[in-house]
Amino acid sequence: MSRPPRLTASDFDPEVLDLFDRYVHGQIDRRGFLSGAAGLLAALTPQFAAAQQVKPDDARLKTSFVEFASPDGYGKARGYLVRPAKARRLLPAVLVIHENRGLNPHIEDIARRLGLAGYIAFAPDALFPLGGYPGDEDAARALFQKLDATKTRQDILAAARMLRTLEGGNGRLGAVGFCWGGGMTNFVATQVPELLAAAPFYGAAPPAEDVAKIRAELLVVLADNDERINAGWPAYEAALKAAGTHYTTFRPPGTQHGFNNDTTPRYDERAAHDAWSRLLALFERTLRKGHRASPG
């Protein structure tokens, strides 16, 4: 029987190590240690209400939950649709792909932020076939493990196709995704040649053999301290260069995986602000004006 890998200090948050040190040196007892650990866990729990930037009933927006067909996926899928309330012209659309928690309040807020920026935003819920986002992050994480990955990918592609022909849209399509959604954004870029722009935030790279299929311009956002995702970046970048894909990268120093998520302690305000500004600049140029940059 093999031994589990030995963990080192770098595997733990400094606050956890400080708490453990105080326990080892008798400054707190076991009960105090467990109580403190529980407090840390509570502190790490997403604070959706506190981080909300755009209220669900903001009068400047029209929001609704929309079901759509996904014949190659689970058959039927559902997502959160946001559009400016008083649009005077046809608008570009943005597919918003959530983390591995489903369509939680944070991702709905991201969609509303894009709505206020003048886009039609649509955030599909990968967990819809299993009842949808359950309202609890731990339960959502557990549900994610039960999804059929092939069907889920097809649901996301069906959402992209639906957006291209949505009433009120001008046919121009972009995508942004975070964590699991970042990897899914990379996948969508390899499968939807009509996609004009994509911004995968700390997402897994697509298979190298599929990179040449990408026609969208990419903004690849990486966290500085993200060993798992960053390990795949050199090969992904080499494939992008070989294919002549238009791309830029943004890797703000000192950031953690999930730094854009303003509901958790991993949030880095300055880095998130800069990443969002770059995202909006990409969409403004490619989706609204139809311009492309030079290859990366």
Task: Enumerate the predicted regions with their spans.
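N-terminal secretory signal peptides
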Residues: M1-I28
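N-terminal cap/lid segment of alpha/beta-hydrolase-fold proteins
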Residues: Q52-K86
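Primarily recognizes the serine-hydrolase "nucleophile elbow" in alpha/beta-hydrolase
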Residues: A158-R215
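Gly/Ser-rich "nucleophile elbow"/oxyanion-hole loop immediately N-terminal to the catalytic nucleophile
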Residues: E137-V176, H291
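Short beta-strand element of the alpha/beta-hydrolase
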Residues: L90-H98
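Cap/lid segment of the alpha/beta-hydrolase catalytic domain
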Residues: L127-T150, G258-T263
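N-terminal secretory signal peptides and thylakoid transit peptides that target proteins
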Residues: D18-L44
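Short beta-strand/loop motif that positions the catalytic acidic residue
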Residues: V220-L222
